Curated annotation (Swiss-Prot):
Keywords in alphabetical order: Ribonucleoprotein, Ribosomal protein, RNA-binding, rRNA-binding
Family: Belongs to the universal ribosomal protein uL14 family.
Organism: Pelotomaculum thermopropionicum (strain DSM 13744 / JCM 10971 / SI)
Summary of the function given for this chain in its UniProt record: Binds to 23S rRNA. Forms part of two intersubunit bridges in the 70S ribosome.
NCBIfam families documented for this protein: rplN_bact
Gene name in the database record: rplN
The protein's name in its UniProt record: Large ribosomal subunit protein uL14
Length: 122
């Protein structure tokens, strides 16, 4: 469950290390984002020589959350950290690698490129 001012780790190789959520997309009253939701973020930490720089405003999709997500079969999935992948306007990732597992819910939201690049889909 991500809201405005939440800090997320970055799960790709764009050069960003930490993001801060500044907007949850999906309507004026939308308060929280979960796995598979798109958010607008500010880059708070970045490595030198990366694609994105500190202070850049980017769009990202949430791939892991500490708050559990309920699945249709009644099971729950949760992760040890909040993480996101920086995306372009066409929902494709800006990086070329994805680090760590991602949730299966991304497949239902048409983030197939992220799912195919991920080392593990849970």
């Amino acid at each position: 469950m991500i809201q405005v001012q939440s800090i997320l780790n970055v799960a790709d190789n764009t050069g960003a290390r930490r993001l801060m959520c500044i907007r949850v997309l999906g309507g004026a009253l939308r308060r929280y984002a979960s796995v598979g939701d798109i958010i607008v973020c500010s880059v708070k930490e970045a490595t030198p020589g990366g694609v994105v720089k500190k202070g850049d405003v980017v769009r990202a999709v949430v791939v892991r959350t500490k708050k559990e997500v309920r699945r249709p079969d009644g099971s729950y999935i949760k992760f040890d950290e909040n993480a996101a992948v920086i995306i372009k306007d066409d929902k494709s990732p800006r990086g070329t690698r994805i680090f760590g597992p991602v949730a299966r819910e991304l497949r239902d939201r048409d983030f197939m490129k992220i799912v195919s690049l991920a080392p593990e889909v849970i």
